[in-house]
Amino acid sequence: MSETVEQEFAPGNHPDLPPPIRTTGIIGWSRKNLFSSPLNTILTLLTLLLLWKSLPPLFEWAVVNSISSADSREQCWNQMSSPGAGACWAFIKDRVELFTYGFYPHELRWRVNISFLLLALALVPVLYEKLPHRKYGLLYSATFPFIAGWLLVGGFGLESVDTDQFGGIMLTLIIGVTGISFSLPIGVALALGRQSNMPVLRILCVLFIEFIRGVPLITLLFVASTMLNYFLPPGTVYALLVRVLIMVTLFASAYMAEVIRGGLQAISKGQHEAGDSLGLTYWQAHRLIILPQAMKISIPGIVSNFIGLYKDTTLVLIIGMMDILGLGNASLADAKWAGLAMEVYIFVALYFFISCFSMSRYSLYLEKKLHTGH
């Protein structure tokens, strides 16, 4: 049998043996990441011990002893062996519409549902490069904010809805998606302006970036709430939501500009010279050579800014806007469900974790896809 195997391959062309099983798969990953040194081994064992002690009671509280059907906290506790022995998810079930739509009129919530669906469709051409006829999809994505604004606010044949009635997950998505969508292009423009050879433009960009970065977001939200109307033309009054969107976008743009500027500075001078040697103009060289490389380098920082901005949307509760966290806090004041803060904060934490973890995983996917180093 061995002679037959040896005759199948010419000398020197025998295929390589598979790598040792200890260096591949889950075993190899564990050896490399969890047990690579004595310190890592100790930390891994301590973490496993902590999980072994904490996960079973948590699972018992959140799943085994939980109550999903009740009309009040007392009814939940009456169904348990002892008060608080399990999670009362009936509270979340009772308030899920409030947490999703805020105070949006019940009979008009179909418009919010359509907006959620259109948002998902608008993300498809942005996230998937190989989508057929992607340029038309990107055109739709660019027009989505105006379509969603018309659906949510009304007008042009639809019943108008005051933005003060926006709240919950809907408000969180509006602020987060708007800030993320507009901060990236504005940040690119500010980063290019800061590196411009035109002194006036460069100074204006530097002043804007440094001023915004030196002021807490809470301060800007208070400015949006109380002072921004004084800087507008007489007789011009914008809704609080519009003013908040402006301030959040400007705040995120300043931080985005610094992230992208770091990517631009990482590009070697030879790349600029390559564009000059091809006879490209400044804008052509940046569009085709410089910016794509800078954006690839900046992906971790960009997504980190997106995640931070999305979590910062909870700060709007300070100026009286009821996002998902604000509505959760307000719901705890209801005597019928008082004392169930744990369930509320776990629900809010899970929502933000799923959203932010999804952005983080997509960032890793992009980094691996665009990795062209050797």
Language-model segments: which ranges?
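Transmembrane alpha-helices and adjacent helix-loop boundaries
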Residues: 2-374
